[in-house]
Design a protein with these regions (language model features):
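Thiamine diphosphate
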Residues: 1-125, 130-131, 139
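Glycine-/acidic-rich phosphate or pyrophosphate-binding loops and their flanking alpha/beta elements
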Residues: 7-14, 219-242, 255, 259
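Short, solvent-exposed amphipathic alpha-helical segments in soluble enzyme
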Residues: 42-44, 88-91, 116, 148-153, ...
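Conformationally flexible catalytic loops at phosphate/diphosphate-handling active centers
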Residues: 45-46, 158-234
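Short helix/loop capping segments that flank catalytic or ligand/cofactor-binding pockets
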Residues: 83, 172-174, 253-255
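Glycine-rich beta-alpha junction loops
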Residues: 104-106, 165-172, 248-250
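Conserved thiamine diphosphate
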Residues: 113-167
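Redox- and metal-dependent alpha/beta enzyme cores, enriched for Fe-S-associated oxidoreductases
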Residues: 231, 237-266, 271, 277-284
Length: 291
């Protein structure tokens, strides 16, 4: 991890964060606005595979993490849709799959630079109950921290994780002060499938009762850690009569709006969910009620 100030793009920050998190490999297929993550990772000399499509990339990550590697992918829009197949399998098998998503506007190919239109897909895409962690950074400094945290939480709690960003954040070049971020300890990876014996690790169940038991167990585990994982940022909510709820790069604009409105004697505050899944509902209810 660098120990001083750097002038970096969001792409460079992601690559740096993944390296510092101990990631060993990346599987991906180029798609705007995340192409530079793949090329940046490849240029760093780390192991990578540009696959034939996002379906192959996702299952490549699944295989890598089962073998004990910290691995990840990056995609957007239509590619993100294809990745939900492998990502929901990772949810079912409790694999520490990390995915960086640079959101696109939809439907389908839509726009390529900005959007908040992949929130539902990131939180609940694929068939399943949405038992995954979704982080929404609002600055390039936070992009670094939350990418590091995505790896740590995924490997510690054994749920897949998404860092949900966009083209504005990824293409922004700004100063990131690594001294202010401080030291972040890594949760080590470990081999999930032993080499010395044959293991059958099911990702499909024959009977409805069997599937029900597995889903309920995973949901219980997810709910147990939700309070530890969920994060929020609040700004001037103590006396707020109007509460703005925003996340990601939009929350950065909301902060400027609040400053302007406060100068006009309007009591406006910001509630920013840093994690969209698990969503910090209890904190929002408390803040919105004014208690």
């Amino acid at each position: 991890m660098p120990t001083d100030k750097k002038f970096m793009t969001g792409y460079e920050v992601v690559v740096c964060a993944c390296q510092d998190a101990g990631a060993e490999s990346m599987y991906g297929y180029p798609i705007t606005p995340t192409c530079e993550i793949l090329s940046g990772w490849a240029n760093s000399g780390k192991s990578y595979l540009q696959t034939e499509d996002e379906i192959a990339a996702g299952f490549g990550v699944c295989g890598a993490v089962m073998a004990g590697q910290k691995s990840f992918t990056a995609s957007a829009g239509p590619g993100h849709i294809l990745l939900q197949d492998s990502f929901s399998m990772a949810e079912a098998m409790r694999l520490p799959f990390v995915m960086i998503v640079g959101q696109r506007g939809g439907p389908s190919s839509g726009t390529v630079i900005y959007s908040q239109q992949e929130v539902t897909l990131a939180c609940y895409g694929g068939n399943g109950e949405g038992m995954r962690f979704v982080y929404s950074p609002s600055s390039i400094a936070e992009l670094y921290k939350l990418t590091r945290q995505a790896f740590n939480d995924a490997w510690h709690y054994r749920f897949p994780a998404v860092v949900l960003t966009d083209g504005y954040t990824l293409k922004t070049r700004g100063v990131i002060d690594f001294d202010k971020i401080g030291t972040i300890e890594n949760i080590p990876a470990h081999q999930l499938v032993p080499e010395d014996k044959v293991v059958h690790w099911p990702n499909i169940y024959t009977f409805e009762e069997e599937l029900y038991d597995e889903v309920m167990l995973a949901q219980k585990d997810f709910e147990a850690v939700a309070g530890d994982v969920a994060m929020v940022e609040e700004l001037q909510t103590e006396d707020a009569e109007i509460l703005i709820i925003a996340h990601g790069i939009v929350a950065a604009s909301a902060k400027d709006a609040i400053e302007i409105l406060r100068k006009q004697d309007k009591k406006v505050g910001l509630f920013r969910p840093i994690t969209l899944r698990p969503f910090p509902k209890k904190q929002l209810d408390k803040t919105a009620s004014g208690k």
